[in-house]
Swiss-Prot record:
InterPro entries: ATPase_A1A0-cplx_hsu. The lineage of its organism: Archaea, Methanobacteriati, Methanobacteriota, Archaeoglobi, Archaeoglobales. It comes from the Archaea. This is Uncharacterized protein AF_1158.
């Protein structure tokens, strides 16, 4: 049977306490590193999500702009045609009015 004296026992206890303290410090350091890594990863995820959100927003805006431009062009064409139709009708009406006035004038001259 091995017997240790009190000094040896105290020394072993002290060494065990030192090992425990070192293990605690190492665990604490590892915990801090893991938290830091998690924060960095979370930041990366947030930045990636924000970048994706910006891209989606730009895509939506570009699509809306294209649609608006297409609608504007369609309206522009339709209204240009309407204006041309009104102009043609106006010219036709002017010719009819001139012809009517001419006929009235000729009729008045014949009776004069």
């Amino acid at each position: 049977m091995v017997t240790m004296d009190r000094t040896e026992i105290l020394e072993k206890i002290k060494q065990a306490e030192i090992k425990v303290e070192e293990a605690i410090r190492a665990a604490e350091e590892e915990r801090k590193n893991k938290i830091l890594e998690a924060k960095m990863k979370a930041r990366e995820i947030i930045e990636s999500a924000e970048a994706e959100a910006v891209k989606v927003k730009e895509d939506i805006l570009n699509s809306a702009r294209q649609q608006i431009e297409a609608e504007k062009e369609e309206i522009r064409k339709r209204e240009t045609k309407n204006i041309e139709d009104y102009a043609k009708k106006g010219k036709d009406n002017i010719m009819k009015a001139v012809e009517m006035l001419y006929n009235e004038f000729v009729g008045m001259m014949e009776h004069a």
